[in-house]
Amino acid sequence: GGDADVVLTYGRPGDVILVGDWDGDGTDTFAVRRGNTYHVKNSMRGGDADAVFHYGRENDAVMVGDWDGNGTDTFAVRRAATYHVKNSLRGGDADTVFTYGRAADITLAGDWDGDGRDTFTVRRGATYHVSNSLRGGAPDTVVTFGRAGDEVHVGDWDGNGTDTLGVRRPVGPAPVAKEVRSAAK
């Protein structure tokens, strides 16, 4: 409980909010995506963006990660099963393009092997196909974890520098209280 440490206004209603360490200072801040335009902020204050650029297409799925291990987060966009990875906060061509998984897969980004570089895992139901490099082909590891309907989160839960999976499982509908009264006359 209690009051927030920081309250700020940034972006517009309908913007997609993204979080990352854009300038490598060790602090995550916000970026907003409006279509294929990114507005990146390096501080927890409102006002103008520190960087504005176009990347990818409006309907691309976007992921945030430190793809090259330099300490700064940038964007990758996914189009079907093809990934377009950018290592700078600028428009233009991707630095790396590859196909991995299937178009219907769910993609998760994380540093799965603790080398300081984020890569992708694709999820099919409760099966995860983990790649430790930005390339197509066979996964480095295949793991079954949780259930197909679980909500999945990625994090370094124990502080060892390696991301792993965590799941949140809905426990079903909220209990319903029903009071039954007899109609006494």
Q: Regions from the language model: what does each represent?
A:
Residues 1-185:
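Trp/Gly-enriched beta-strand/coil motifs that build multi-repeat beta-propeller-like domains
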